[in-house]
Amino acid sequence: MPALKKTVLTVISAALLSSLVVGPAFADDKAKTDDNQPRPTGPMSTVGGKRLGLIGTQVELGPGAPALPKHLTGRSWIVADAESGQVLASHNAHWRLPPASTLKMLFADTVLPKLQPRTMTHLVTPEDLAGVGEGSSLVGIKENETYTVHDLWLGVFLRSGNDAVHVLSSMYGGVPTTVAAMQKHAEELQALDTHVVSPDGYDFPKQVSSAYDLTLFARSGLQKADFREYCSTATAEFPGEQKKGKKRESFQIQNTNRLITGDIGVDPYKGIAGVKNGYTTHAGNTFTGVAERNGRVLLVTVMNPSSEESHAVYKEAASLLDWGFSASGKVTPVGDLVPPLSATPGKGSESADAEAARKKVAAKAGTVAANGGSHAGIGIALSIVGGLLVLLAGGVFLINRRWPLPDLVRRRPRA
C-alpha cells in the first residue's frame, strides 16, 4: 500500500442534532420483536435525538418505504447513513450492553494514530501477554518473537486477537494507560454509554457500550486510512516462529467478519468494507459493518440477537443494510450520529475544493468498480490520495448535506 503524502482526516459532519420533539415511535407491524425479549429496565440516553432514547423500534416510514425486515432479534440495533449521520431506524439504540470485541474499534481509533510508523517493531515479552484473559481469541503471538505494528493490527482486526491488543497496549504505555485513553476518546466522540474496563472487549463487570456508540466508533475510525485497510482485509500472512538459520515461517489468517469472508449459510455482502465483529459469553454476538451501494454508504450495528440460527448477527445486519439501501430517502430520520465535542460547527455549504474532491472520489470509485478492483481477491477500503480531500484546519466540522467518507472498493462478485 503506497505511503500517503498526507494523513487526511475527514471532518465534515452530519446535520445538527434535532431539537424537535417528535411524535410517538412507529414500529412497523411486519417487524415486531418477540414480546419475551429482554428490554432496557431504565432510562436511556438521548444523545442524537429524543427518539433514540425510547424503548423499542424507532422508524418512521414514508411513502414507498419498505417495511423493516421480519424477525429481528437483536437486543439493540441501528442503521444509519455514514455520510449524513442520519439514523434511518433503531431499536434500543442506547441500551448499555457488553460489547465484546466490537470495542476493539475504539481501541484502534484511539491507539492506531499514535503507533507509527507501522513498520516499527516490538520484541514481545512475557509481561506483554500477562493480562490476556482465559479463553480469549488469539492470533498466535509468541514471547521472544519480534512483530511489526502492521502485523499486530492484522492480528487485531482479522483474528480479533486479544494477545495482539495487549502487545499494542504495552507499546502504548500499558493497559491502564490505554483504557484511560480509550475512555477519554469515547467521551470526546460523545459515546457516553461506553465504560471501558479492558482494551480488548473481554467480559469484565461494568464494561458496556451501545449500538449507538459502536457506530460512532466505526464512523470515526473509518476516517483513518490504516483503519479502513485493516478492517476490510479478508486474509493475510502472519509471522510464525523464527528458527535459527532459517527463513521465518508464516501462516495465513482470515477475517472472522463473515460478511467479508462468507461461511456456510452466509454469503459475503456486496459492497461490504468492514468493520468488526465480536462474541463473548455475556455479550453474545455483536457486529458493526459498513457497506456502499450506488454511492450511498451505510453503517449498521447489531448486538446480541436471540435467534439460534447460525450466523444470526450477520444475517440480521445484512437484512438491515438491504432495508437501509432501499429505504434511504423514503423515511424520516429518527436521530443523528453526533460529531465529536471538539468539532466546531461551520456554516454554509461545501467549499468548491471539497465539492471537486468529492466528484474526483466518485469518479475514481466508479473506475474501480468497473474494473472489478480487488486486493488479493478481497474488498479493501481505499487510501485517500494525497490532496484528494481538503484538510480543514482546527478540527472544524462543516454542517453540510454530505459527510464524505472516503470511497470504498466494491467487492468483486464471487462466482
Where are the model-predicted features located?
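Active-site-adjacent loops and short helices of periplasmic peptidoglycan-processing enzymes
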Residues: P2-G23, A27-Y212, L216-G221, A225
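Domain-terminus/edge residues, biased toward the C-terminal soluble/receptor-binding domains
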Residues: L192, D203-D213, A218-A415
